[in-house]
Swiss-Prot record:
Gene from which the chain derives: psbL
Record text on subunit structure and interactions: PSII is composed of 1 copy each of membrane proteins PsbA, PsbB, PsbC, PsbD, PsbE, PsbF, PsbH, PsbI, PsbJ, PsbK, PsbL, PsbM, PsbT, PsbX, PsbY, PsbZ, Psb30/Ycf12, at least 3 peripheral proteins of the oxygen-evolving complex and a large number of cofactors. It forms dimeric complexes.
Protein name: Photosystem II reaction center protein L
Stated family: Belongs to the PsbL family.
Record Pfam families: PsbL (PF02419)
Originating species: Zygnema circumcarinatum
Main location: plastid
Amino acid sequence: MTQPNPNKQSVELNRTSLFWGLLLIFVLAVLFSSYFFN
């Protein structure tokens, strides 16, 4: 089982992890702002 282009696979994985990281930071920022400004 050899991947035709492993570089593209790692780039896709990187983009997905970056997206989830930004989403997590956004959710934490919303929670903290609602906690502080309430």
